[in-house]
Amino acid sequence: MERTFLMIKPDAVQRNLIGEIISRIERKGLKLVGGKFMTVPQSLAEEHYAEHTDKPFYKHLISFITSAPVFAMVVEGEDAVHVARHIIGKTNPSEATPGTIRGDLGLTVGRNIIHGSDSVESANKEINLWFKADELSEYSESRESWLYE
């Protein structure tokens, strides 16, 4: 099964949306295999967003992501990266489809609720950056036979 990294950002944590977001992800068939509630250290934020270093929003992004706790998680399922990206919606909430997390709950592009890996390669990199191997669980759910052929 494929895994992907998701991070519920400070704006969603402050708005008490963690449960709502996880519920939507699980209802779509993705299984939570790791999670942690944490304040992001500056060094981790900088490494995670290293590809944006030269962009004008970089300093604001680092400041925002380290300003309050996040809920970092790893989910697993068939085509997990694609499924999660579909549930999340477009980066800008005003362009996101209603029914997606950002379409329903996001406020602005700078307060867009959640981060999700954009490829299998990014997912693997981000999972290894945020989680140690022993922080992730391997288990079966009874519903799996109902979800996957």
From Swiss-Prot:
SUPFAM superfamilies: Nucleoside diphosphate kinase, NDK. GO terms for cellular component: cytoplasm. It comes from the Bacteria. Keywords: ATP-binding, Cytoplasm, Kinase, Magnesium, Metal-binding, Nucleotide metabolism, Nucleotide-binding, Phosphoprotein, Transferase. ATP binds at residues 9, 57, 85, 91, 102, 112. Its EC number is 2.7.4.6. It catalyses: a 2'-deoxyribonucleoside 5'-diphosphate + ATP = a 2'-deoxyribonucleoside 5'-triphosphate + ADP; a ribonucleoside 5'-diphosphate + ATP = a ribonucleoside 5'-triphosphate + ADP. Pfam families: NDK. One of its GO terms (biological process) is UTP biosynthetic process. One of its GO terms (molecular function) is nucleoside diphosphate kinase activity. HAMAP family: NDP_kinase. This is Nucleoside diphosphate kinase. It comes from Staphylococcus saprophyticus subsp. saprophyticus (strain ATCC 15305 / DSM 20229 / NCIMB 8711 / NCTC 7292 / S-41).
